[in-house]
């Protein structure tokens, strides 16, 4: 997943709890208000404290307001330079502060940062509304846009002008004063609901733990998974027990290997019921209200549905085109998944006490079928996927494809001890940018994996601003005297997010508002992910962590042969989530739906197998209800 600087401005404030927070610091002591004085002007994380954000955000918003006011006060005729470019270059301090705040809120949050997020969610929304609905500013933009045919603009300039004009029109600039006020109210409520949705989801995810007291209940689990459970128990002051959580490196191995079917069910139900427990953190009403407000906003802006509004600017263009594409994939995927289910059921039927396959059995029996059909035990592959070797493999692919060099820089500050920083150079040795890698689980880090930008490439006159990007993951770190050893899925995730990082590092544009369509940003990551398990690439980086021996060709062939194994399941769970997303966002009225009944209607319509749960259910579908992927997952 890619997080841009723009989306940081929109969503960095979405998770929160109340706690005391230092509101201010002496202006001359605020690191945001002066050059950092670090290599490549990277953030001096060790000098930035919670007390610096409030005054920095306040000053940054005021600074951008003044920049916008200056544009509207220009007495000369609106031009591309004095209006469009000036607006594009406004808000640099806000980008600077938001970039740092965003990476910390995602990767290593604290109660103080959460409190700042609570305060600034409505303030930032109001600030964005003030710019988007500024009548004087829009009239200047429109004046330039209306004479675009006479301006002899470059392709980049034309795209910036088009994007700027469309953003304002789509943001409500043409609405009446009364409708603009209604739009403000909708945007304000949506921002707070998104905040609450994410808050609830994190609470549900991070507070749950399955405590195992008997060692026999761990039968089947690999030693590394047992050790990780014991360490989690010690951290929870439950020595002598084992703790498993809803973090992916914990629950996935448990479902893959634990023989105890009852505990598999308990853990998987907890995962699938996040936000759906009728408690203080329930997200059902929130998701329904978000969907209804999006319909209201779309209607206000002249669109029949939220999906029509979103997709107009994406490559897909229309909801009908997306439905056609997804439905074309659905039936073949469902047929493959049914065959996979039948193979697992056949295996269960040979056991002493057979039973119907359930969703919490899928990972366990898929692993057994893979072992039987391909003689491949995924856990036995981990010793060949030491994190540092996998990352170097990704670097080497980028070196061969694009001539890049990656040099670790220990002189650049980080925000946590296990974060590493690399300077990226071109074939000629010229500086291209900076990459932070932050791969391991830690308290305060949100689930998942993502790429983001602290600074994007830009040109100001003859000066070039080089990018600073980061990759964040949630892999299990070094433990029990062993380095971090990745699963196949984590290997592909590392390559995937690195593809996003390469996009951020290598994209060159003269203006900020020239990003890719939302449904186009996944292409670089998919290209890079494709190389992760290529035989030639595997031979280059997959080496046993203890002996240094390269992965045997026999194992590579097993990986290749099993490459399409379980793809029916994977495709069905993804497509089910995509279709659920589209069903929510093709609603044409503001009636509040009963969330569980609504999604069940979707799953019944597409005939989703009961043995497979959608990749995301509505109460924890953060991509669409608090992220930037609504009508686009």
Label every PLM stretch briefly.
Residues 7-18:
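Bacterial N-terminal signal peptides
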Residues 10, 25-222, 632:
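N-terminal helix-rich structural modules
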Residues 37-52, 101-120, 143-185, 245-285, ...:
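Short His/Asp/Glu-rich catalytic/ion-coordination signatures at enzyme active sites or charged loops
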Residues 160, 184, 189-192, 199, ...:
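Active-site-proximal, well-structured secondary-structure segments within enzyme catalytic domains
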Residues 304, 499-511:
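Catalytic Zn2+-binding segment of zinc metalloproteases
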Residues 476-495:
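Short pre-active-site segment immediately N-terminal to the catalytic Zn-binding motif
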Residues 489-504, 525:
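Active-site recognition of the HExxH zinc-binding catalytic motif
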Residues 491, 495, 568-586, 609, ...:
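C-terminal substrate/ligand-recognition segments
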């Amino acid at each position: 997943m890619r997080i841009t600087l723009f989306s940081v401005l929109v969503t960095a404030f979405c998770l929160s709890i109340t706690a005391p927070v230092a509101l201010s610091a002496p202006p001359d002591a605020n690191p945001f208000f002066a050059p950092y004085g670090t290599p490549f002007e990277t953030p001096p994380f060790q000098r930035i404290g919670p007390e610096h954000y409030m005054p920095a955000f306040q000053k940054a918003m005021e600074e951008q307001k003044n920049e916008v006011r200056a544009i509207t006060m220009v007495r000369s005729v609106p031009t591309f330079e004095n209006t469009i470019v000036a607006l594009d270059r406004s808000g640099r301090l806000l980008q600077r502060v938001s970039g740092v705040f965003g990476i910390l809120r995602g990767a290593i949050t604290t109660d103080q940062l959460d409190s700042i997020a609570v305060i600034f969610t409505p303030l930032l929304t109001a600030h964005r509304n003030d710019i988007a609905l500024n009548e004087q500013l829009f009239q200047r933009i429109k004046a330039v846009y209306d004479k675009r045919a006479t301006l002899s603009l470059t392709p980049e300039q034309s795209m910036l002008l088009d994007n700027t004009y469309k953003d304002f029109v789509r943001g409500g600039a043409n609405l009446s004063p009364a409708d603009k006020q209604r739009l403000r109210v909708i945007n304000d409520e949506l921002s707070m609901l998104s905040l609450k949705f994410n808050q609830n989801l994190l609470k549900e995810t991070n507070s749950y733990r399955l405590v195992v007291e008997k060692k026999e209940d761990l039968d089947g689990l690999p030693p590394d998974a047992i050790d990780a459970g014991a360490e989690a128990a010690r951290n929870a002051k439950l020595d002598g027990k084992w703790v498993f959580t809803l973090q992916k490196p914990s629950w996935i191995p448990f479902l893959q290997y634990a023989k105890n079917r009852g505990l598999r069910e308990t853990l998987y139900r907890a995962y699938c019921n996040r936000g759906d427990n009728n408690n203080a953190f329930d997200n059902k009403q929130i998701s329904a209200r978000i969907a209804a407000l999006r319909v209201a906003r779309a209607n206000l802006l002249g669109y029949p549905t939220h999906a029509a509004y979103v997709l107009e600017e994406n490559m897909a263009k229309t909801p009908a085109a997306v439905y056609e594409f997804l439905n074309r994939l659905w039936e073949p995927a469902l047929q493959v998944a049914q065959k996979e289910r039948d193979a697992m059921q056949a295996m269960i039927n040979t056991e002493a006490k057979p039973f119907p396959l359930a969703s919490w059995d899928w990972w366990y029996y898929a692993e057994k079928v893979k072992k039987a059909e391909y003689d491949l035990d995924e856990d036995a592959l981990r010793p060949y996927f030491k994190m540092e070797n996998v990352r170097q493999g990704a670097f080497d692919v980028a070196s061969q494809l694009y001539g890049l060099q990656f040099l670790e820089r220990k002189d650049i500050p980080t925000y946590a001890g296990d974060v590493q920083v690399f300077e990226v150079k071109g074939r000629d040795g010229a500086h291209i940018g900076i990459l932070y890698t932050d791969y391991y689980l830690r308290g305060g880090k949100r689930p998942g994996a993502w790429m983001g930008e602290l600074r994007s490439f830009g040109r100001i006159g003859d000066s070039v601003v080089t990018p600073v990007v980061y990759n964040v993951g949630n892999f299990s770190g070094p433990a029990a005297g062993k380095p971090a050893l990745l699963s196949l899925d984590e290997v592909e995730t590392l390559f995937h997010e690195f593809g996003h990082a390469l996009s951020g590092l290598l994209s060159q544009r003269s203006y900020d508002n020239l990003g890719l369509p939302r449904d186009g940003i996944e292409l670089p990551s998919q290209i890079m992910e494709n190389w992760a398990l290529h035989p030639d690439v595997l031979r280059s980086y997959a080496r046993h962590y203890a002996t240094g021996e390269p992965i045997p060709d026999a194992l590579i062939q097993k990986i290749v042969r099993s490459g399409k194994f379980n793809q029916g399941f994977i495709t069905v769970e993804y497509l089910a989530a995509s279709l659920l997303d589209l069903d929510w966002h093709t609603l044409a009225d503001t009636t509040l739906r009963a969330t569980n009944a609504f999604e069940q209607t979707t799953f019944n319509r597409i005939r989703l197998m009961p043995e497979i749960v959608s990749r995301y259910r509505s109460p924890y579908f953060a991509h669409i209800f608090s992220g930037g992927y609504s009508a686009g997952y």
